[in-house]
Design a protein with these regions (language model features):
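Bacterial Sec-dependent N-terminal signal peptides
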Residues: 1-21
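N-terminal cap/lid segment of alpha/beta-hydrolase-fold proteins
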Residues: 18-51, 96, 100, 166-167
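Short beta-strand element of the alpha/beta-hydrolase
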Residues: 49-59
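A fold-wide structural signal in alpha/beta-hydrolase
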Residues: 52, 78-85, 125, 151
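Active-site loop/turn elements of alpha/beta-hydrolase fold enzymes
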Residues: 58, 82, 89-91, 157
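Glycine/Thr-rich phosphate-binding loops of Rossmann-like dinucleotide-binding domains
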Residues: 62-64, 162-163
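Catalytic nucleophile-loop/oxyanion-hole region of alpha/beta-hydrolase
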Residues: 65-72, 85-121
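Primarily recognizes the serine-hydrolase "nucleophile elbow" in alpha/beta-hydrolase
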Residues: 105-170
Length: 171
């Protein structure tokens, strides 16, 4: 049993260790927005320009599930040929446009680095889970055209803040 487990692990370790991760502040010239940042996971294989995804973790707009809805997802997408970008967005704290402005800025940074990161600027999507799904849907419908994603994947998104349809943790 131990040999089988070690054999299986030997297939997954190079995938995780082979990924390059870069970290960037979204608003380096604005100290008050200092916590907004992105983590960029590059696919192991080079070659033609890759599609990209901006990943918006959930957390009820009170915090962020950065590991299982962010970094773990990014590792999987990067291992499957995507440039995967995890967004650590700011909490709204009464100003509901703050997370959306961070997501729009992230899309601008991704497309602006298309050549450097070897990604296809016409194949940039957004992924969101829970409250991050709400943010991804908002980005897909409300963002300026230049910052609008080409596709969206919503995992158990919050689609309404109506008392009858939204769980209490997302209000």
């Amino acid at each position: 049993m131990k040999h089988i487990l070690l054999l299986l692990l030997s297939f997954f370790v190079p995938v995780v260790w082979g990924q390059q991760v870069e970290q960037f502040k979204l608003w380096p010239d604005k100290p008050e927005a200092g916590e907004a940042e992105i983590f960029v996971y590059h696919p192991a294989k080079g070659g033609k320009a890759a599609p990209a995804v901006l990943i918006c973790p959930g957390g009820g707009y009170r915090g962020l599930a950065m590991n299982h809805e962010g970094h773990d997802m990014a590792k999987w997408y990067a291992s499957n040929g995507f440039v995967a970008v995890v967004l650590k967005y700011r909490m709204p704290e009464g100003v509901h446009t703050i997370p959306l402005s961070d997501a729009e800025k992230a899309m601008s940074v991704i497309r602006g680095n298309a050549a450097k990161w070897n990604l296809d600027a016409n194949k940039v999507g957004v992924i969101g889970s829970s409250a991050g799904g709400h943010l991804a849907a908002s980005l897909s419908t409300l963002a300026a055209d230049a910052n609008r994603p080409d596709f969206a994947i919503l995992y158990y998104p919050v689609i309404s803040f109506d008392n009858m349809t939204t769980h209490g943790g997302s209000k």
